[in-house]
Amino acid sequence: MTVAIGRSDSERGWFDVLDDWLKRDRFVFLGWSGLLLLPCAYLAVGAWFTGTTFVTSWYTHGLASSYLEGCNFLTAAVSTPANSMGHSILFVWGPEAQGDFTRWCQIGGLWTFTALHGALGLIGFTLRQFEIARLIGLRPYNAIAFSGPIAVFVSVFLLYPLGQAGWFFAPSFGVAAIFRFLLFFQGFHNWTLNPFHMMGVAGVLGAALLCAIHGATVENTLFEDGDGSNTFPAFNPTQAEETYSMVTANRFWSQIFGVAFSNKRWLHFFMLFVPVTGLWMSAIGVVGLGVNLRAYDFVSQEIRAAEDPEFETFYTKNLLLNEGIRAWMAVQDQPHENFVFSEEVLPRGNAL
């Protein structure tokens, strides 16, 4: 006797029909996650192209920022809203723009549109990895790994400005604009000396080193199992045997370092752990800066350097440079504040 478990076609509702259609096997998988990913990614990318092509930053930053004004790919940007907008979501129909699309673009509405849809698109991409992994019986480590970039994006573009006075202090979406934000972070937060930044650098550069070492080691130990000039055509995706010698790789690195991974599972988990942990540490550090937490202020060196003109360290020299960044950037970056600094307050010292 055969027992059928499930519901008959007559009991299937619209949700079941939609679920089947979304999860149908097609060239590009759609899925429930696609309902979030595809429209949000399309709108975020479209808004960025629109802003960098046509929209000025004159009303928000006093800058030219579009191809229409003469910028190139490196200098164009979708700039953050005006400082006076605070943390407003800036809906087109909101009290700021009042349904005027041109005014909405002028006050920085495209930035909030791009940032929020971009964040939702990234989250949708992670959910897509979860969904496909679940359907084909994989573990969800790809989605877990992608949580690192999401954490960095959300912390830098959303959480940091939420802790500050407004969206104005977030990075604008552009290459040179990101560079300016890095200088801002250093000058106002001494970011390079922050331990969370150090862990982030160690994670990202360490991951690059691990990736290079791993790729080179596998290439070095490929089995010569083909007749061609190289071993690439000899590989078959369905072959049962190994394509490189783990034993040889282990012996090589044991001679180099004295220790080596003998377990492929630990090796690849370590390659996952290093960059993802580094990105998460960076994200945590940025959230801390959002609420103006300080890290590594060596006050004793500052006091001694102030009292003894012959005593200076790389730390005190960097502090002078940070003071210069703050003094000169504030005038340029916030022209609406009409800052005026007299010559006496500008930083002086051997560092300059």
From Swiss-Prot:
Reactions the enzyme catalyzes: 2 a plastoquinone + 4 hnu + 2 H2O = 2 a plastoquinol + O2
Binding-site residues for a plastoquinone, renumbered to this chain: 214, 261
GO terms classed as biological process: photosynthetic electron transport in photosystem II
Ligand binding (pheophytin a): 129, 142
Enzyme Commission numbers on file: 1.10.3.9
Protein keywords: Chlorophyll, Chromophore, Cyanelle, Electron transport, Iron, Magnesium, Membrane, Metal-binding, Oxidoreductase, Photosynthesis, Photosystem II, Plastid, Thylakoid, Transmembrane, Transmembrane helix, Transport
Residues annotated as transmembrane: 40-60, 124-140, 152-165, 207-227, 278-294
Positions contributing to Fe cation binding: 214, 268
Membrane topology: Multi-pass membrane protein
Binding site for chlorophyll a PD2: 197
Top-rank taxon: Eukaryota
Keyword Zinc-finger annotated: no
GO MF, one example: iron ion binding
Cofactor note: The D1/D2 heterodimer binds P680, chlorophylls that are the primary electron donor of PSII, and subsequent electron acceptors. It shares a non-heme iron and each subunit binds pheophytin, quinone, additional chlorophylls, carotenoids and lipids. There is also a Cl(-1) ion associated with D1 and D2, which is required for oxygen evolution. The PSII complex binds additional chlorophylls, carotenoids and specific lipids.
Binding site for chlorophyll a ChlzD2: 117
Cited InterPro entries: D1/D2, Photo_II_D1/D2_sf, Photo_RC_L/M, Photo_RC_L/M_CS, PSII_PsbD/D2
GO cellular component annotations of the record: chloroplast thylakoid membrane; cyanelle thylakoid membrane; photosystem II
Family: Belongs to the reaction center PufL/M/PsbA/D family.
Function: Photosystem II (PSII) is a light-driven water:plastoquinone oxidoreductase that uses light energy to abstract electrons from H(2)O, generating O(2) and a proton gradient subsequently used for ATP formation. It consists of a core antenna complex that captures photons, and an electron transfer chain that converts photonic excitation into a charge separation. The D1/D2 (PsbA/PsbD) reaction center heterodimer binds P680, the primary electron donor of PSII as well as several subsequent electron acceptors. D2 is needed for assembly of a stable PSII complex.
PANTHER family the record matches: PHOTOSYSTEM II D2 PROTEIN, PHOTOSYSTEM II PROTEIN D1
Other comments on record: 2 of the reaction center chlorophylls (ChlD1 and ChlD2) are entirely coordinated by water.
Stated name of the protein: Photosystem II D2 protein
Native organism: Cyanophora paradoxa
Encoding gene (name): psbD
